[in-house]
Amino acid sequence: MNFFLPAFFLSLFGFFTVLGIRHDLLFSQGFYFFLAFFSFFFVKKYALFFRKNWSFFFWTVFFLLIITFIIGLETRGSRRWLNFYFFNFQSSEFLKVFFIFYLADILTREGYYIDQLKNFVKAILTFLIIVFLIFKQPDLGNAIIFSLIFLIMLLNSAIPKKIIFNFIVLAFLLLPGLWFFLKDYQKQRIVAFLNPHIDYQGTSYNIIQSIISVGSGGFFGRGLGFGTQSKLRFLPENHTDFIFASLVEQFGFFGGIMVLILYGLLFYFLTKKALFFLEKKSESENFLIVIGIIAYFFFQMVINIGMNMGIMPVTGIVLPFISYGGSAFLSSFILLALIP
C-alpha cells in the first residue's frame, strides 16, 4: 500500500486537473479510475500468478503490438491503438510493463561468459524489434522510454561490463544517424526546442503556450476551472502531453511542488524496496524488476515535466498517474501491483 497511496493522490491531481479543463471527459476519466483501481487490487491479489506467467502476457502483448502495426486505429497520422469498441488499447503501454519482467529474467540468468553473451543478444534483438515497431507507429516518446528502461536495467544486470560498454559506445556512434529516420514534425520539435523563438505560431507554439500556462499560475494557481490558457484551449493537448502545465496553471507552484513530493515518496518507497533486494544475492531478479519500474516512472516524469517547462523537446510522453488516457493510466497501476 506504500506504493498505492502516492499514486492515488497523484491520480486525484490528474482527475481534478482534467475536470477543470475538459468537462466532456469526466465520464471516461471516471471509468478509467474505476478500471485502474479495480485492476490494481485484482492484480495485487493474484500477483504471484501474474509474475509467474509474465512470459505469456509479454508475448501476447508483443503479438498485439505487431497487429497494431498492421491494422491499428490511425489518428493524426499515428497508428498506436487497437479499437476494442469500449476501449482503445495501446499495446506499447502494456508491453512496457512485461518488458521489465522479460529483461529481469533474461539478464539475470547465470552461466559462462558465452552464455551471458547469448542472453544479451536475445535481449537486444527483442528490444530492437519492439523499438522499431513503436518508432514506425510513429511514437518517438515510447521508443525513448523503452530504450532508457533497457539501458538502466542493462547497467544494473549481471551481464559483463565489457559487453555493456561496447554496446553503449556503438549505440552512441549510431545515434546521430537516427535524425534521418525522424518524421518532419519530430525534427521540427527538436529545432523548436533548441530555438523556441523560431516560429511562434508553428512548431514553437506548444512550448510557448506551455511556459505561459506554468507562469500564469502564480503560487496558488488561478483555481479549478479558471485556467485561461488550458481551459480556453490555447494550450494544445492540455489533458495529456501538457497536463502538468494545466495543473500548475490551476493549482499554482504549490500544486506543482505537491506533485513532485508525491513522486518523491513513490521513488523513496521503490528505492527502499530495491535496496532490500540488493542485499540478498538470491533476489537479483526482483532487484532488477524494481530498478526497471523506477526507470519506467522516473524517466516519464522527468521528460514530461521537462517538456512542459520548455527544457526538453516535445516527445509525446505522458505524465504517470496524471495524464488523461486509459492504457497508460491502467498499465501504471498494474505495474505497481506487480512489484515483488
Model regions: which residues?
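A juxtamembrane structural motif centered on a specific transmembrane helix
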Residues: 18, 299-340
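Hydrophobic alpha-helical transmembrane segments of multi-pass inner membrane proteins, especially
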Residues: 4-203, 245-309, 334
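Residue-level recognition of oxygen-bearing side chains
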Residues: 94, 219, 329
